[in-house]
Amino acid sequence: MKILVRYHDGAVPLTILPQRDWIDLCAAETVTMHAGEFRIISLGVSMQLPEGYEAHIVPRSSTFRKWGILQANSMGVIDESYCGDDDVWGFPALAMRDTTIARGDRICQFRVMRKMDKPELVTVERLDNASRGGFGSTGTR
């Protein structure tokens, strides 16, 4: 699979580590944030994904512990149409404490996945399955 990558100012070159199918993304700028502040941190790259694929962006497991930031959209999804020269990838960060993220800090990671086939949605009156409870009910009696 070939992915075309354009690096912008401050970008750290991507590396693929052996035996990993997630690729780390680094902050392309140094950012100081205060508790409660939201900011999109530039990752400094634009990419052209292969047709029929999308990228999933999530925080690294240490991101919250090291910098106290959460990814505000839970998981970022970038489809192959977001492929222009200036379609720079970003990390939507919500700071839970005062923090500084330095240029080059590995704050998130991505992987490329094949998009699902277009589903056929069928409206029915009943699903004829047992109801299991509402959200948050798993594990309760």
Segments and roles (model prediction):
Residues 1-141:
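DUTPase catalytic domain/fold
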